[in-house]
Amino acid sequence: MAKPFRSYTGGASMSIPPHSFFENTVADVPSPGSCTHLTGADHVASLRAALQSLTGQLGTLDRWGSLLADVLCGPARGRLLAAGNGGSAAQAQHLTAELVGRYRADRPPFSAICLTAETSSLTAIANDYPADELFARQVEAHGRDGDVLVLLSTSGRSPNAVAAARRARENGITVLALTGPEPNPLAAAADDAVCIDSPWTATVQECHLVALHLICAAFDAAVLAEPARVASGPTLGAAR
C-alpha cells in the first residue's frame, strides 16, 4: 500500500510509487564507440544551457535553505543527512562540511552527516544486506522525525538513493533530491526535487555544486537574520 507524505511546502499529498516502479533503475553506461566526446566549447555550451534550467528553480533552493535553518535551529535541533554515489558522494560530503564548518560568515556549527563517509558502516551494510540498504539503513539509524535528507543522483535512478528516500519518508524525514532530467524515480520518491535538464553527467554534477552553494547561502542568510535563535559558542570568532 503506497504511503502518502506530508509536503512541507503546503502542497497536496501524493503517494509513494510502489516498489516495482524502481526496478531496473541503474543508469546505462555508454560503450566507447557510442560515447559522444565533447570539446571544451561544447562542454561550456552545455553548462550554460543547464544553468538556465537551474535559474528557473532558484526559489526552490531558497526554500530549502530556509527549511534547513528552521530544522537545524529549531527547538529539537534537527539534523541534515546527505548521500550520493561517486561524484555525488563527494558533493554530499561537501554540503555537510559547509554546515559543520562554515560557508562564508562565521557562525556556530550544525549537525550534518554524510552517509558515504563512514567506511566501516558502509562495508558492514554492503557485506550483510542487499545493496539498496546502503543508505536506507543509515537513514533509519541516524534520522529522526523532522530531520532532512538531501540525496544527489545525476541520473535520478540510483536504487540505493531511491530506497533511502522511501525509508526516510516512512520515518518522518523530509527528502530533498538533486537529480538530472525529470521524470526520474528519485524525484518522484522525494518531497521536493531540483532537476537539471542536461543529458551530460558532468554538466549535471557541476550544476549540483552551484545548487549546493545556493542552499548554503540561503541557509546562512536565514540563520544570521535571526541570531537570537542560534546559541553562541566558543567557536564564534575563532576562525583564522
List each model region and its residues.
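Generic N-terminal amphipathic, Lys/Arg-enriched alpha-helix
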Residues: 5, 13-57
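A short, charged, Gly/Pro-tolerant segment at domain boundaries
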Residues: 227-240
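Glycine-rich phosphate-binding loops that contact phosphosugars or nucleotide phosphates
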Residues: 82, 88, 93-229
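Hydrophobic packing residues in well-ordered alpha-helices of helical domains and bundles
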Residues: 40, 44, 61-65, 92
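Polybasic, low-complexity intrinsically disordered segments
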Residues: 1-4, 72
